[in-house]
Amino acid sequence: MRLAIFDTNLYVGHWERALYQDRWDALHRAYVVRQSAVVLSELRRGARTRDAQQLVEDLRRIAPVVWEPTPADWWEAGKLVRKIGDAEGWDRDKRRDFQNDALIALTARRHGATVVTADVTDFGLLSREIRISVLPIR
């Protein structure tokens, strides 16, 4: 049984722009998809319309399992954000956004799951620092 976390950008692209239609069903057949508390929070934060809010609420409601970062994940995320952010010369805003990606990656790693994402750049940087499986979707 292969496990996966879909990154926020996959849901947004699929719901708002009908992206990834050809791969959506195949991904669900290939993986048991688990929800990340971080992804659900990002989706809820960005849901501006009633329809979008309902989609996010439905996703949370039907999720049999929601994976959350542990205190150790938060601790390691701080180190990763500092190290990668310093190397890349990022400002505070970019570092804050990247922290969520680090938390998603660390949660996936702990469960042996693949992160499915359109954010090839940030998860590529993370995969150089920690052992995670990333499936890029374009």
Show which residues each predicted segment covers.
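Alpha-helix capping/helix-boundary segments
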Residues: 10-11, 39, 73, 103-104, ...
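Active-site neighborhoods of divalent-metal-dependent phosphate/nucleic-acid chemistry enzymes
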Residues: 65-114, 118
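Short, hinge-like loop/turn segments at secondary-structure boundaries
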Residues: 50-54, 84-85, 133-136
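Residue-level signal for well-ordered alpha-helical positions
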Residues: 17-18, 46, 80, 126-130
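Structured helix-beta-strand junction loops
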Residues: 29-31, 61-62, 111, 129
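Phosphate- and divalent-cation-binding pockets in alpha/beta enzyme and binding domains
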Residues: 42, 76, 125-126
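Acidic, PIN/NYN-like endoribonuclease modules and their adjacent C-terminal/linker elements
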Residues: 1-3, 105, 109-138
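Short, well-structured N-terminal submotif of metal-dependent ribonuclease cores
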Residues: 1-35, 44-60
